[in-house]
A protein has these predicted regions:
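Active-site lining segments of carbohydrate-active enzymes
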Residues: 83-87, 148-251, 347-364
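Long, well-ordered core segments of solenoidal/helical folds
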Residues: 57, 66-77, 117-134, 165-190, ...
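Carbohydrate-active enzyme catalytic cores, enriched for enzymes
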Residues: 187, 214, 252-417, 472-482, ...
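Low-complexity, Ser/Thr/Pro/Gly-enriched N-terminal "stalk/linker" regions
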Residues: 15-84
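Sec-dependent signal peptide recognition
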Residues: 1-8
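Solvent-exposed loop and edge beta-strand segments that line ligand/cofactor-binding
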Residues: 38, 78-96, 128-141, 179-202, ...
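CBM-like, beta-strand-rich accessory domains located in the C-terminal region of large
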Residues: 333-338, 429-621
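Well-ordered alpha-helical scaffold segments within catalytic/enzyme domains
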Residues: 35-55, 97-113, 125-133, 143-161, ...
């Protein structure tokens, strides 16, 4: 009977302690549309796509690429239950997901039975795994999504027995271990499914998509899992507020959004509603995040455990959905430009229509993501030679964070001058534990920021949360200031300002106060450029791919530029096994002072007008 079941569900869900702003109905399947397909797309969506292929050359080219991917998948070895690093099945889950999505879309576009036949062999192999590695629940969630798409997009091709078998794999390998975690919040899976970071969105979305796929055949199991998924995903979605920024950085923002967009679109196509999840404050601004974090050279501001060229600066297929969902034409066209280079099934499914670029409102040159303490400044849009700065303050306690408060990246004249090294190997000993701050790339010294009084301990406070105090376009320059004081407990005050002039020159200004104590400060900038330092040490020339950048040390006058290898300081820990930072050197300023110090470095592109030697206090910016 349904009513006793619903009563038990309400009791079970009540154990969740995370606040929930949206009330989930007792029977979320009340409006279920039983027709397949309904996971991310319905029959009308696929029909529209077929029509689009007749008139949109880019879409047609992408479709050919996806069909080639599907054909190649038919000849690849079947998936095996292997944990390559001893911990994760994730690479296997992702391979299954990508293959099934390509095969499913190829079936929808061609009707060729070879695609579901090949998909069945893959599903059968992965379905017969002993498990989908629930201790690392991302693996389970991604595989559940793959099976949801397989069941749904190729539903017409399956026999009744095949449909039931896929349902059973989804239930036993995906929903059952999820329910154990949902009903036991203190368990490992319980924590993973309730995570307030990317894990929460990926895990709950994958399970939610699995539940929606089987809902017509197994409504009781689907209803129970779906209610929990809808409830548990909300705390992580709340972290997009107020302006769409994501504290874990671009890469994990993209990972979370890939799954959230899949889930929300599946809710809409399956039930006609996402229960208001897409209206959670800040979420509608999320398409802005990758748009603004990408510099003119095509690199992303890769703070935290992210890379500057994450996913090969590839298509962001979910961005097409989000941009159209939230009517963000700039983001939509940004995705369309990328999608052709790295075509995939979802990128084609959600490919935004071509638009007249002249009808797209110009974006702001300056953008602040206030909650995460991140700002981007640029001189103009649509110019690969434009000046660009990514700058962050932020919270060192955030999942995947580095000790990178105060760090920045810098592009101008088509070159990426100040770079972020990104993450190290996740399988290094205790990478996410007590040894995390021993690894160079994760320490302040491995980022483009300050180190105060260096030693073996973490070189910023691991609990610091620092705000941006200014972010504005002044007309002649973009400005951002961060109060970094909480990151440096050995100082009484530390503030950093970024001044990006319209000619692309950048001033980095640091105002420090040691409270009367002797202090040593290192100023670091990692660069792939060749560094030549002047005889007096007051200036340096950076050379890269035929372009030149001049660095001038305006203050203090008694300091000098140096260059160092991108390796730990002699006083720092240096565990074995870390990545070698090949081709990267550090431009360095060292200052020993007592009381107050102001460090000002000007970076000027070749032919650019040098900034005035006078220094304006940050308080007067």
């Amino acid at each position: 009977m349904i009513l006793p079941l619903i009563a038990s569900l309400l009791l079970a869900v009540s154990v969740i302690t995370d606040p929930s702003p949206i009330e989930i109905p007792a029977d979320p399947l009340a409006t279920l549309r039983t027709q397949h397909p309904r996971i991310m797309a319905n029959v009308d969506d696929f029909a529209r796509l077929k029509e689009t292929l007749k008139t949109d050359p880019q879409a047609s080219k992408m479709a050919q690429a996806v069909i080639r991917q599907a054909d190649a998948s038919l000849n690849k070895p079947l998936p095996m239950h292997i944990l390559p690093d001893g911990k994760r099945l994730l690479s296997i889950s992702r391979d299954v997901k990508n293959r099934i999505q390509a095969l499913g879309l190829a079936w929808q576009l061609t009707g060729d039975k070879k695609y579901p036949d090949g998909a069945w062999r893959i599903l059968q192999a992965a379905g017969n795994f002993p498990d989908w590695n629930p201790p690392h629940f991302l693996d389970t969630a991604e595989m559940t999504r793959a099976f949801a798409v397989g069941l749904d997009w190729m539903n017409e091709a399956w026999t009744t027995d095949q449909k039931e078998q896929i349902c059973q794999w989804i239930i036993k390998r995906g929903l059952d271990p999820a329910m154990a975690g949902y009903k036991d919040p203190a368990s490992k899976n319980g924590h993973q499914l309730r995570a307030r970071h990317n894990w929460g969105q990926v895990c709950d979305s994958g399970i939610g998509m699995g539940a929606l796929a089987i809902a017509d055949m197994h409504p009781d199991e689907a209803r129970e899992a779906l209610r929990f998924a809808l409830q548990c995903i909300q705390p992580s979605l709340s972290h997009y507020a107020p302006d769409g920024g994501w504290a874990e950085g671009y890469g994990y923002y993209g990972y979370a959004m890939e799954y959230t967009s899949g889930f929300l679109s599946s809710l809409d196509r399956s039930l006609g509603t996402d229960f208001g999840l897409s209206k959670i404050p800040g979420f509608s601004f999320s398409p802005d995040f990758p748009t603004y974090l990408e510099g003119p050279c095509g690199n992303y501001f890769g703070f935290a455990d992210c890379g500057e060229r994450e996913h090969k600066v590839s298509s962001l297929p979910w961005a097409g959905w989000a941009a159209m969902q939230f009517q963000n034409p700039a983001s939509a066209q940004n995705q369309r430009k990328k999608a052709e280079t790295y075509p995939d099934a979802i990128g084609l499914l959600w490919l935004p229509p071509a638009m007249d670029q002249s009808k797209i409102s110009p974006s702001s040159r300056v953008k602040q993501f206030s909650k995460i303490g991140c700002a981007t400044l640029r001189t103009k849009w649509g110019d690969t030679n434009a000046g660009f700065v990514g700058f962050k303050a932020g919270d060192n306690k955030v999942n995947h964070s580095h000790l990178d408060i105060g760090s920045f990246v810098y592009d101008v004249e088509g070159q990426h001058w100040a770079v972020d090294l990104g993450a190290d190997n996740y399988n290094l000993p205790d990478y996410f534990g007590k040894k995390r701050w021993d690894y160079y790339r994760l320490r302040a010294e491995g980022n483009n920021t300050l180190v105060a009084n260096p030693g073996p301990a973490p070189d910023q406070s691991t609990k610091a949360d620092c705000p941006l105090t200014l972010c504005t376009d002044r007309g002649d320059a973009g400005l951002a200031i961060g109060d970094l004081s909480a990151a440096y407990p050995s100082l009484t005050s530390a503030k950093r300002g970024m001044h990006l002039a319209n000619n692309g020159s950048l001033r980095i200004q640091d105002e420090l106060d040691s409270g009367g104590k002797e202090a040593t400060i290192f100023w670091f900038m990692h660069t792939p450029a060749k560094i030549e330092i002047s005889q007096d040490g007051q200036s340096a020339t950076l050379l890269q791919k035929g372009k030149t950048l001049r660095a001038d040390l305006i203050s203090p006058t008694n300091a000098r530029f140096e260059k160092m290898e991108a390796v730990p300081l002699p006083t720092s820990p240096n565990p074995p096994g870390q990545m070698v930072n090949k081709g990267v050197t550090k431009l360095v300023v060292r200052s020993d002072f007592k009381h107050k110090e102001t460090i000002v470095v000007d970076l000027t592109p070749e032919g650019g007008e040098l900034a005035p030697l006078s220094v304006t206090p940050l308080s007067a910016w």
